[in-house]
Amino acid sequence: MKALLDLFKQVTQKEEFDSIKIGLASPEKIRSWSYGEVKKPETINYRTFKPERDGLFCAKIFGPVKDYECLCGKYKRLKHRGVICEKCGVEVTLSKVRRERMGHIELASPVAHIWFLKSLPSRLGMVLDMTLRDIERVLYFEAYVVTDPGLTPLQRCQLLTDDDYRAKTEEYGDDFRASMGAEGIRDLLNTLNIRVEIDDLRREMGTTGSETKMKKISKRLKVLEAFSKSGIKPEWMILAVLPVLPPELRPLVPLDGGRFATSDLNDLYRRVINRNNRLKRLLELKAPEIIVRNEKRMLQEAVDSLLDNGRRGKAMTGANKRPLKSLADMIKGKGGRFRQNLLGKRVDYSGRSVIVVGPQLKLHQCGLPKKMALELFKPFIFNKLEIMGIASTIKAAKREVENESPIVWDILEDVIREHPVMLNRAPTLHRLGIQAFEPVLIEGKAIQLHPLVCAAFNADFDGDQMAVHVPLSLEAQMECRTLMMSTNNVLSPANGEPIIVPSQDIVLGLYYTTREKVNARGEGMYFANISEVSRAYENRVIELNARIFVRIREYELADGERREKITRYETTVGRALLSEILPAGLPFPLINKVLKKKEISKLINASFRRCGLRETVIFADKLMYAGFSYATRAGISICLDDMLTPAQKDAIISASEKEVQEIELQYTSGLVTQGERYNKVVDIWGRAGDQVAKAMMDQLGVEPIIDPETGTAKTGESGKPLIQESFNSIYMMADSGARGSAAQIRQLAGMRGLMAKPDGSIIETPITANFREGLNVLQYFISTHGARKGLADTALKTANSGYLTRRLVDVTQDLVVTQEDCGTSNGVVMKALVEGGEVIEALRERILGRVVANDIINPEHQAVIYPAGMLLDENAVDTIEMLGIDEVKVRTPLTCETRYGLCAKCYGRDLGRGTPVNVGEAVGVIAAQSIGEPGTQLTMRTFHIGGAASRTAVASQVESKSNGIVRYSPTMRYVTNARNELIAISRSGEVVIQDDNGRERERHKAPYGATLLIRDGEVVKAGQVLAAWDPHTRPIITEYSGKVRFENVEEGVTVAKQIDEVTGLSTLVVIDPKRRGVVQTKGLRPVVKLLDEEGKEVRLAGSNLPVHITFQVGSIITVRDGQQVSVGEVLARIPQESSKTRDITGGLPRVAELFEARSPKDAGVLAEVTGIVSFGKDTKGKQRLVITDLDGVSHEYLIPKDKHVTAHDGQVVNKGESIVDGPADPHDILRLLGVEALARYITDEVQDVYRLQGVKINDKHIEVIVRQMLRRVQIVDSGDTRFIPGEQVERAEMLAENEQVELEGKRPATYEYMLLGITKASLSTDSFISAASFQETTRVLTEAAIMGKKDDLRGLKENVIVGRLIPAGTGLTFHNTRKRQRLMLDTGEAPPLSEEETGEIRNSGYAV
C-alpha cells in the first residue's frame, strides 16, 4: 500500500529550465498565484488545533492538513482525490500542497515596497526624480504631492504642506490634483511616460556640460531603460495586493503545556491583517481623514516590517523585546536561505570521530572503526542480506544488523572492499581538505589517518576530528577513485610541488640514517652488494653511519626500456640500505647525501617526474616506513644538556652594553637625536642576538671526533682537536627540518633577544637570558606582551583570512576551462625576478608549465627550438636556462580571448596533476583556494616564536654577488664631494654588474644619498661593497657649492627649535604648515639658496633659474645660515620611521587591499604623459608641477606642500613614471601603463607578502584573479550600440554587442578596462543569484527585479543553488549534452552523442 501511495505522491514533473528570471509582480500576477484571500488574523483554534477558516492557516485556501482528508472528515482516502468538500470547502489532496499554495491580502490602501524605497539609491526616487526625504514625507502623510497640475502654475511632483494645500485649493479649486500617501506616488508612477522621459534624458545628456549632472542623468537613464527593456511597470513598486507565504514555510508548532512555537512571519502578517481590516472598517464608516491617515501610515509600517524589519525606523519586536525576523532577514546573511540552506546543505551518510596516527597504512587507506562502518554502510549491508537470502525483508535485515550477528561482520568486510570513503577535516581551505581513501576496518573508536596526508589536511593528532562521507552512487564512487583518491593528489595545486612530503619523525629518521660519522665501527669496508651490507649491519659488524664502499645496482630508463648498470660508490651504511627502496630509474646519487626535509621533497618530485605517479606513491610509503623504523632505532631524545649556551655569550653581551652606553653618551652630548639613539640601540641588540645565535649554532653544530680505541678526542697536526658535524639531538632536529628552527633554538640556548610591544614597536632592553637559564620576573613580564599578542592575532586573523578566501572564491567561481585553444598570440614577457641584486625567482620557475606565445629561438644559430603553443616542461626549461635565454613570452589567463571561461593553452599545466589542464577544470576556485589557504595557515602560525622581535635588519649597503665589471645605469646621476667620494643624487639609479660577455649578472638599486664605492667600468670581486648609506635617515644633498642663505626659515613659524631635554642642544625641524598658528604663513616653505663669492645666487647649470632647495615636513636642518657648503654635502636629514616588526599581519591586510584594488591613502602621482618637468607658481598650500609633452601641451598637477616630489626641474619623465613619492595606485597603473603592467604589479606585490612567509604560490593563480577583477569595461563612446557612455558592462557582453553592430555595418563602441575590487566584482557579476548569495542580498535583488534580470546559470554557485550538477569537471559533459539535446528539440537535428555521454546522462538521473 505504501509503495502505491508513493507512486501517487510523484505528481510534480522534473522542471527543465535554462535560466531563471526575476522581476516585479503585478497585482494581477499575485492574485493569479493565490488560492484565496486571507481575511482574518486568526491562526488555529486553540482547542481543536484545527486551522481557522479564512485565517492565516486556512485549509480551504492552503490545502488539507492531513494527506487525502478534508478538514471536517467527510472525505477520507485516496478515492476522493481532487474532490472539494462542500461543507468545509477543502480540496482532498496531499498535505504537502501547504508548502506551495499561496494566499493574498487585498490591501485597503496601496503601500510602497520598502526595498524600492529605502534600498539606496532609492529606485522610487530615481524614477520620479524626487529625493528620498520628499517621497518619505508623502508616504508617511506629512505632505501632499501634486499628481496633476492641470493649468495651474504648480509643478508635477511638487510637495505641499497641509496649509499650502488648503491655500492652493482655495486659490485654484479643482484645477489641480494632489494627494498623500502611496496613492499619490502610485498616481505619479501611473502617469509617467517612460519612453518620453528616456528621450528627454538622452537629449539632455548631449547638451549638459556638468560632470555631476551627467552622472545623475546616466544613473536615472539606466533605471528607466531597465524598466522599459524589462516590460515592468514602475507602479508595481507600490503594492495593492500582498502575497501570503504558504503556511508550512512559516509553521506553528504546538509545544508541551499548551504553548506554541511560531515563525515570526505569522506575527508580522497578523499585524498587517489587523491594521488592514481596521482600515477597511474606518473607510466604510467614512471616518475623519486624520484617523484614516494614521491607520494608513500604520499599515504602511506593518507591511514595511513584514518585508524588511528594521529597515525604516525601529524594528517591530515580539513579546520578548526581540526584533521579529522578516522576509528579508530569512534570505540574507550567514543564517539566511542562500548560505545556510542552498549553499550549505548537510550531507547524509556521514560520521565524525577523533583521528589517530596509522603508520602501518598504505597511502590510499584509512582505518575506519567497525562500529562506524556498520552504521555508514547500512543500506549496502541490508541489500546484501536480502540478496543472500539471510533476511527476507528490510525489517529483518535491520534486526540482523542491530544484533550484530557474526555474518554481518563478514558482509561488512565484503561491502567495504574497494568502496572508497571520503575524509574531510574542517576548515576545508583547499580541495585537498577532502580526499578519498579505501577503508580498513579497525577496532576502537578513532579513525586512523595516514601520516603523509596530514600536510594536505593540515591535521595533527592532538585531538583533531575528521568527518567521513560515503559516496553512494556508482558515479560518485568512480569519481572518488579516479579524482579524489589520496594517491592521485600527490602535488599541491597551489605550486605544483609534492604535498605528500614526510615531516617530523620520518625526516629525523631518514636524516639520521644518511648522516656520516667519522671513525664509526666498520669504516672503510668494501661490500659486493646491499644484502652483504644488510647482513653486516644486522650482526653489528658495522654502524649505520659508517663510511663504506659498496657496489650498487641501478636501473636506467632509456627509450622506455630498463637498463641495468652496477657502479661502486663511496657511501654510508644507511644510504646503501635506503637504496633498496629507490624506484627503478632514479640514480643512487639522489640519496647519496644527507637527506633533509628539502632534499626529501626534491627526491619525491624527481621520482614523480621520472617514474610516474604509481611508483612515487609506493616510494613515499616505503620512505615513511623506513623513516619511522630508523627514527626508532636512532633513539634521538632531547634533554637539558643538549642546549649548549655558547661560552662567548657574556663577552658579546658586555661588549654590546658598552656600545649602548657610548650611544647614550653621544645622545647626552647632543650628537644624535632621540629617534636615532633608539634605532641604534635596537640595532646593536639585534646584532648581539645574531652574534650569540651564530656562536651557539657554531658550537652546537660541531663535535670532536672520538678515537674508538682510546675513547678520547682525536687531534690534528697542530694539536687542535679534529671536529665533525654534530650529533646533538636538538641540532639534528633543526638541521634536518624535522622540528624547530634556528630562531627557536636561539631562544632555548642563546638569548631571547628583543621583544615587541603590542603596537609592534620594539622594547629597547632585550631579554639576555634564554629558556635554559630561565627568565626572571621582569623578563617573563616583557615576554607576555608578545605571547598574548600572538594569541589575539590568531583569533582575529583566522576570521579575516577566511573572509578573504570567501571573497576570492566568489569572484572566480564561474571561471572554468571551457575550450582547448582560444587562438590568441598575446601573452606576457617573463623575466627572472631580481631584487636587491638577488635572483628571487629564477626564469625557469616562472615559465615552467606555461605555454609559449611566440617561437623560442636559439640565440646561437637562430633556429626555432620550441614553437609557439608548446607547453614548457622540466626538460624544456632546463634547455632554455642552459642556452642563457633571458626572457620568454608566455600565454597567460589575462590575455585569453575565450568569452566565458578560459582556454587550456592560456592556463597551461594543471599544477595538481602535472599534465596540461583539462577542459572543465574549475581553475577559478583553485586559484582562490591557493591564495586563501596559506593566509589562514600563516595567521594561525604567528604565535610560534613568542613575539621575539624578528625585525629584519635594515640594509645599509649592497655587495656584489659575483665577479664582473661595474656599469652604472643610464638613470644614475652623481656628484663628487670634497672628500672625493661619489654621492648618488638620482632616485632610480642602479649599479649593474656584467660578466665578460656583457651579459647582465646582477643589478642593485643605489638610493639617493648613497656613497658609491666603485666607479663605472671598474672590475669587482664577489663580496665587494658597491655602495653604502645610512638606513635611518634620508639626506637632502646639494649639487652645487656656495654659501647657505635661509629663506622663510623662521623659528616658530616654519621651523621649530627642538631642544633636547637631556642634552640641552637645539636642532631645527621643519613643521607641518597645517599645525602653524598664523594663517598668513600657510604658504611659506623653508628654502635654502646658495650664494657665490660675489654674493649672487648660484644658478642651475644651463638655465638662469636660481638654485633653491626646499625642505619637506619633518626634515632636521643640519647646516646653519651663512655656512659655506661644497658639492655633495648634506643640508638636512629626514628621519625614517623606526621599522615595526613585519609578520603576515601586515601581510594579510596588504593582500586584501591589493585584491580590493583600493587606492592607497597617500598615493604617489604618476606622470600622465611623457614630457619635460617644470615648476609653476605655487597656489594655496600646494606646489604646481607642469609636464610639457612632446607636442607642447602642458599638463598641470597640484601637489600638497608636504609631499615629496621626486622629479626635478628639466627632467624628462616617461608616461607612468612616478613624480611624487608614495605607494602606487593600481587604477593609475592600469590607466597609464596597461593591463600587463597592472598584472605584474599586483602579482609581484602579492607574491612579496607570501614570499616573506616562505609560501610558494604560482603566479598563474594571481593572474586568474586579476582577470576577474578586469572583467568589466566602461563605455567611452557608445557608437551605435545600446550602451550609455560611462556605463559599466561585462567585457564578454560588450564584445558580443560590438560584433553584432559591426556585422550590420554600424559603428562599434569604444571602451576602457575597469579595475574592480574582488567584492565589487562579485557583486557586479551578471548572475544575480551568485551576487545575492554573496553580500548585500537586498540591494542585489532589488536591482535585479527592476531590470527583470535573467540568470543564465553559467557559474558554479548558481547551479548549486538550483540543485544541479555544476558546469565543471564531470558536470560539464552533462551540461553540454543537455544543450545538445535542447538544440535537437529546437532544430530537429543534432550532432550524434558519443556512447560515454549517453551513459553519463542515463546515470545522472536526469530524464533524457
UniProtKB/Swiss-Prot annotation:
One of its GO terms (biological process) is DNA-templated transcription. Pfam families: RNA_pol_Rpb1_1 (PF04997), RNA_pol_Rpb1_2 (PF00623), RNA_pol_Rpb1_3 (PF04983), RNA_pol_Rpb1_4 (PF05000), RNA_pol_Rpb1_5 (PF04998). Residues 1386-1408 are annotated as: Disordered. One of its GO terms (molecular function) is magnesium ion binding. It comes from the Bacteria. SUPFAM superfamilies: beta and beta-prime subunits of DNA dependent RNA-polymerase (SSF64484). Binds 1 Mg(2+) ion per subunit. Its EC number is 2.7.7.6. Zn(2+) 2 binds at residues 822, 896, 903, 906. Mg(2+) binds at residues 460, 462, 464. Keywords: DNA-directed RNA polymerase, Magnesium, Metal-binding, Nucleotidyltransferase, Transcription, Transferase, Zinc. It catalyses: RNA(n) + a ribonucleoside 5'-triphosphate = RNA(n+1) + diphosphate. Its cofactor is Mg(2+); Zn(2+). CDD domains: RNAP_beta'_C, RNAP_beta'_N. DNA-dependent RNA polymerase catalyzes the transcription of DNA into RNA using the four ribonucleoside triphosphates as substrates. PANTHER family: DNA-DIRECTED RNA POLYMERASE (PTHR19376), DNA-DIRECTED RNA POLYMERASE SUBUNIT BETA (PTHR19376:SF54). Belongs to the RNA polymerase beta' chain family. The RNAP catalytic core consists of 2 alpha, 1 beta, 1 beta' and 1 omega subunit. When a sigma factor is associated with the core the holoenzyme is formed, which can initiate transcription. This is DNA-directed RNA polymerase subunit beta'. The gene is rpoC.
